[in-house]
């Protein structure tokens, strides 16, 4: 037998089953389910709608409403019915997802233990299933809202967060899933991905962080207190590197010749003393300040003596 699974994105998951008669099956097993067809559904084809197994106790609710929604659908066109394969000896189970126009189907072998509920047979063409984006009348929308207003979520385990869609994993067809108590939410109040704050909401992160400034004192003199790790990333003064005697001699000789250096002279001194041009410039600045202090100090001492 072949089974089609029709899943609506924003409605409850309904299953549409198609029974295809295989040569090795008995016609008496399906004779009771073919009584309500009145000639529209042949003995080898039967479509049935049942609720998704994950809906649990709400499956009966969908079954009561589906008769009023699809009661006016007729099937004069028998060309849309899937003919049973004459050469296949084993039936198969197929299900698909009609999201948009294409139909994606899968098939499972008949060896799986499929528990199917038998209901009165009816044929529903593919055009009768309205997509969520299509316009529907108000009366039909309200009736469909009562039928398909199931929102997969855990009603009692946690509080639902607005803006997040709870997607339940479909159980295996061959297994017997446990009944779930899903929350019943009206369809009119549903807003697709309506986030409360939005993804682009600004998050304020304070840059200032309080740090402990107290020093831990150990009773043992050999133990060195740990410094905070932030100090390693903080830019501080470089350790003073003293110049060698040869470097100082070269710098003093150039300073005696001229207290101010040019660009070419700075490059030449940098190459001769193996110092950077910045170091040479800073040394000349400090040397001028030192000489100025020495002159001012000598003048003050001379004025004090007189």
Swiss-Prot record:
The keyword Signal does not apply. It is found in: Nucleus. GO terms for molecular function: DNA binding; DNA-binding transcription factor activity, RNA polymerase II-specific. One of its GO terms (cellular component) is nucleus. Keywords: Developmental protein, DNA-binding, Homeobox, Nucleus, Transcription, Transcription regulation. Disulfide bonds: none annotated. Residues 236-295 bind DNA. The keyword Transcription regulation applies. Residues 68-90 are annotated as: Disordered. PROSITE patterns: HOMEOBOX_1, HOMEOBOX_2. CDD domains: homeodomain. Its main location: nucleus. Pfam families: Homeodomain (PF00046), HoxA13_N (PF12284). InterPro entries: AP_axis_regulatory_Homeobox, HD, Homeobox_CS, Homeodomain-like_sf, HoxA13_N. Sequence-specific transcription factor which is part of a developmental regulatory system that provides cells with specific positional identities on the anterior-posterior axis. PANTHER family: HOMEOBOX PROTEIN HOX-C13, SEGMENTATION PROTEIN FUSHI TARAZU-LIKE PROTEIN. Belongs to the Abd-B homeobox family. This is Homeobox protein Hox-C13a.
